[in-house]
Amino acid sequence: MPGKQFPLKEYIAALAKFLDTIEYQDDNFSHEQRVESLRYVYQHTAKHFDQPIEKAAVTVSPKRLQAVMRTSTLVTVYCWVKCPLDVMVGVSIYFAYIIMLDDSSDTPTTEMKTFCEDLIKGRPQKHLFWQRMNAHLTNFLRYYDGFCAITIFRSTLDFFQGCWIEQNNFGGFPGSSYFPHFLRRLNGLGGISSATLFPRSEFDEGTVFEEIVTAIAQIEPQLTLCNDLISFYKEYDSPRDQINLVSNLAHCNGVSWEIAFEELTRDTILYCEQLVTVFKGKDPKVEATVRAFVHGYVTWHLCDPRFRMQEVYEQAGQSEADLKFRHFYEQATSIGVIDFKLWASPSRLSSDKRKHEQAFGDDPQNGKTRVLESIGQANASEAVALAPLA
């Protein structure tokens, strides 16, 4: 909505109510645990993309790849708190591929003509994304039982189609009231983000099947709505971000952006309330996993500079809602803002890797039970968006 004054008062009130609803308090890690987890996941993500076959396939610049890996590492460590480290690495690699797909601008019509036939007959895919993603999923899905694995693959297909639609810069026809939600569900990655929380090493899918299915159902809308609410400030006056849920709701339903924003706020709080209450009295490990994910997801948003939350914080006044938002923001940044040099500095990579090998050898179980003394390869300053969190 370029040219119009941003509704700061209403926006801060919505954020404060949202954060209050989920009772935001990220106690997932100590500072040392967070830094060490970032080091481990980043270093192993970088190791994956340093393989010759990946180097040949990646089309982005080295600087861009470093930024992509930093982002995938951050969101994974902050949100997949209860997962073993080897699972975190798999999630981080997955999101790196997703970010690079989201960066692309070429419509995949030609390469996708035989996608279904190739998939059914087990032939190699023609699209580069699917070649590399399928190779990764072949290993990554081994961490999961059947229902979660299918959900992860289905969510990947959905995201690809969502990108395909957005590459055509299409936000829906007027009168197509469900289209904005349809598109947001496709590109929201809610399925992958929820199903990957439940690896078979931590959960028996058969025992907590109902809880897992409910988590997938509830996290899908909550994930995207939370992102859309927090992103509203940065997208408000950005010409390149005008194809978003609020603008699509206004366009398709023939209403003002104010009404569309009210709908976004109402739905965000509704689904957050449900997510907070629905697991009470259910399996405690599932409840703790979902809670850790939701609170870590908020921390990542509040601390990532690209969402410009510091600007909102600096403009906040002294009303009850403003003070509440300021409190939550200060709480998040006190734990979530960490200098990249502490975990993604190239100067420390070799020495830390040697320390890790001397301390733990190559036993993979150590990687699941203790954060290893290792660190990433890059400290690029380039910002990057993660599609479902953009």
From Swiss-Prot:
Reactions accelerated catalytically: (2E,6E)-farnesyl diphosphate = (1R,4R,5S)-acoradiene + diphosphate
Amino-acid positions noted as binding Mg(2+) 2 in the UniProt annotation, renumbered to this chain: N227, S231, E235
E.C. number(s) listed in UniProt: 4.2.3.-
Chain residues that bind Mg(2+) 3: D241, I243
GO MF annotations in UniProt: metal ion binding; trichodiene synthase activity
Motif (NSE motif): 225-235
Locus of motif WxxxxxRY motif: 316-323
Keywords of the record: Lyase, Magnesium, Metal-binding
One Pfam family matching this protein: TRI5
GO biological process, any: sesquiterpenoid biosynthetic process
Cofactor(s) needed for function: Mg(2+)
Pathway(s) the chain acts in: Secondary metabolite biosynthesis; terpenoid biosynthesis
Family to which this protein belongs: Belongs to the trichodiene synthase family.
Function according to Swiss-Prot or TrEMBL: Terpene cyclase; part of the gene cluster that mediates the biosynthesis of flavunoidine, an alkaloidal terpenoid with a tetracyclic cage-like core connected to dimethylcadaverine via a C-N bond and acylated with 5,5-dimethyl-L-pipecolate. The tetracyclic core is synthesized by the terpene cyclase flvE and the cytochrome P450 monooxygenase flvD.
Domain-related comment: The conserved active-site motif D(D/E)XX(D/E) is required for coordinating the divalent metal ions that stabilize the PPI moiety of the substrate.
Protein name: Terpene cyclase flvE
Gene giving rise to this polypeptide: flvE
